[in-house]
């Protein structure tokens, strides 16, 4: 997948009474959106690892910002949100980031994250932290990092992305920037088993 690419992230808290069937419909309801122009890949992450702040992560790679704009206003997405998403979701974080790498060719686990930084942090400092994340990953256990800065200033976080692995146990090799006053200030994440939607 040639970049840069737009990556749309959804980190979801489900309502307590959600049934397995409703959860399946939430995930599978995204599948028809794969046919939309500019959609390159759709996947999901289950929040089973202890670092997870949310239950489920959904992610969509799109060709560019124009494809993201079309995706975000498409009637199929509106139907999905009304019928499958909103009835079962308690709250969620949505973010759009610019990435230069797509997903790993094959993966069985992922660490989906959104990071915030102090307001006086420059974009080059955010990019440097993301490059450090990519450089510090244990290449023997992790399959790749697809991360970047927010596409615009309306986003709730400054950076986000995905780290891919073969299995959830390999995600322990992920090394995020420390959460302190000098670096990242807030993190939301979903980590665990992951798969593309076919």
Explain the meaning of each model-derived region.
Residues 80:
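Acidic, metal/ion-handling microdomains and their immediate structural contexts
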Residues 1-56, 63-73, 87-198:
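Short S/T/G/P-rich N-terminal loop/turn motif that feeds into the first structured element of a domain
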């Amino acid at each position: 997948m040639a970049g840069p690419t737009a990556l749309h992230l959804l980190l979801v808290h489900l309502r307590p009474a959600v049934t397995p069937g409703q959860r399946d419909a939430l995930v599978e309801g995204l599948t028809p959106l794969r046919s939309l122009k500019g959609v390159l890949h759709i996947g999901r992450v289950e929040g089973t690892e202890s670092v997870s702040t949310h239950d489920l992560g959904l992610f969509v790679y799109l060709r560019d910002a124009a494809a993201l704009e079309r995706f975000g206003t498409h009637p199929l997405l509106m139907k999905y949100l009304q019928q499958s998403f909103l009835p079962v979701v308690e709250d969620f974080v949505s973010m759009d980031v610019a990435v230069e790498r797509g997903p790993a060719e094959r993966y069985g686990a992922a660490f989906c994250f959104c990071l915030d930084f102090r307001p006086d942090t420059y974009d080059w400092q955010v990019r440097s932290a993301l490059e450090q994340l990519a450089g510090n990953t244990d290449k023997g256990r992790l399959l790749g990092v697809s991360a970047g800065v927010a596409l615009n200033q309306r986003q709730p976080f400054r950076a986000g992305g995905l780290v891919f692995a073969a299995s959830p146990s390999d995600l322990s090799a992920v090394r995020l920037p420390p959460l302190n006053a000098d670096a990242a200030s807030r993190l939301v994440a979903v980590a665990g088993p992951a798969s593309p939607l076919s």
